[in-house]
Amino acid sequence: MAVYDTIILDIEGTVCSISFVKNVLFPYFLDKLPFLLEQVEFPLDHTDNVTVTQILAKFPERYTKSKECLKTYINELVANDIKDPTLKQLQGIVWQAGYEEGEIVVDLYNDVIEALDRWKKEDKSVYIYSSGSIKAQKLLFSHVKFKSETRDLTNYIKGYYDPTSVGSKIESESYLNILKDLNKDPESAIFLSDNIKEVAASIRAGIKSLVVKRPGNTVHHDNQSFDFVYSFDNV
């Protein structure tokens, strides 16, 4: 395998299980949502300088006229896994409280922490590109379960990207935007994700890209025109 000095990683299904997001983060958010909405007056005052109100006001106005209407709309977004940037902002606030209270910790795949340590020793730069907000990405990597303790792994990560900063993960232009921001050539970078559409977009940008196969991920047939890896051990 060629030598790369820039490693770009997806999160869900790549460094941690899809079930962590679906079975831990999403339910936690939905459980806290009613309490969050109880703290806000409806209809929303769009001139309010309270952070939560400002975020809620970004949802379509037809859904923000009442608490129940907005709650139903947000629940539908989550149920359908809609990558809505306003939803991501709101989730980030709720998850931050959960992480800080010790109610949320993330289990990374066993090979991930070892790889991050190895890449740092090899002077390689690691970046995260996820559909989750940059705030949520940083929270996740700063609250990692490791044996009997919680570790902060943000010192291993040089930078973070999300769709609001560089564009959609299934568009090749987004990966070119990352390279431009890093002042890197495509040949110096490698991208890893469990999502074939994301890998295809990255390849179109000229970046070496690998499909990560983890337990519980979507089944892909190895005869497709992609390179697969089952862990980060040989990356």
From Swiss-Prot:
Its EC number is 3.1.3.77. It holds the Pfam family Hydrolase. It is found in: Cytoplasm; Nucleus. One of its GO terms (molecular function) is magnesium ion binding. Binds 1 Mg(2+) ion per subunit. Bifunctional enzyme that catalyzes the enolization of 2,3-diketo-5-methylthiopentyl-1-phosphate (DK-MTP-1-P) into the intermediate 2-hydroxy-3-keto-5-methylthiopentenyl-1-phosphate (HK-MTPenyl-1-P), which is then dephosphorylated to form the acireductone 1,2-dihydroxy-3-keto-5-methylthiopentene (DHK-MTPene). Belongs to the HAD-like hydrolase superfamily. MasA/MtnC family. This is Enolase-phosphatase E1. It comes from Komagataella phaffii (strain GS115 / ATCC 20864).
